[in-house]
Amino acid sequence: MLRNNKTIIIKYFLNLINGAFLVLGLLFMGFGAWLLLDRNNFLTAFDENNHFIVPISQILIGMGSSTVLFCLLGYIGIHNEIRWLLIVYAVLITWTFAVQVVLSAFIITKKEEVQQLWHDKIDFVISEYGSKDKPEDITKWTILNALQKTLQCCGQHNYTDWIKNKNKENSGQVPCSCTKSTLRKWFCDEPLNATYLEGCENKISAWYNVNVLTLIGINFGLLTSEVFQVSLTVCFFKNIKNIIHAEM
């Protein structure tokens, strides 16, 4: 009786954690697909050659797909108490654990490289911004405008970065997104006291660092849950085995 009660309790917690993993797997797949397919967001627009976005997207989609698969297998194994499926389930969780460790290491080691890439790309976008010969870059200019308006900043270091832009009607102009203006055009003539003086670099770096730390924190939380899930699966497996032996 006690052994049966223990089995029910372990099964309940296994299904609970398994359901949470299923939702997370779907979220990983969705986020990975969004990064891969949406070319109108800040992350993809400044990574033209897909040095970072494609590998990260593929890892997220692969990890999400495998998570959904092992959750479905796990549900069948747990519900029907199929021992070989429980072994497969534990192995797949261990594999996902290893992939997440690699992903965390990749994010940490590439952090400075990603920041340098964005730094160089923003400099390039500033120099080409508003060019009549580059209509294909309008998406990048729009994203830069959204960044400057949302973060209330101007240029990479400050508003003087826009001096190097040669597409203005006069040298004193800055993008309308650098000001409190609501005009929908590339450049505006606004006084200095109506212009955002702080550069965007520090604000983007702060945003990026916070999100990287958040992502790593979530990842380590998942790793802990996976260790707990594997331990529960092993306990469940042993409990089923003991029940079978007791009934023989």
From Swiss-Prot:
The chain crosses the membrane at residues 16-36, 59-79, 87-107. Glycans are attached at N5, N158. SUPFAM superfamilies: Tetraspanin. InterPro entries: Tetraspanin/Peripherin (IPR018499), Tetraspanin_animals (IPR000301), Tetraspanin_EC2_sf (IPR008952). It is a multi-pass membrane protein. The keyword Transmembrane applies. Keywords: Glycoprotein, Membrane, Transmembrane, Transmembrane helix. This is Tetraspanin-19. It comes from the Eukaryota. Its main location: membrane. Belongs to the tetraspanin (TM4SF) family. It is found in: Membrane. One of its GO terms (cellular component) is plasma membrane.
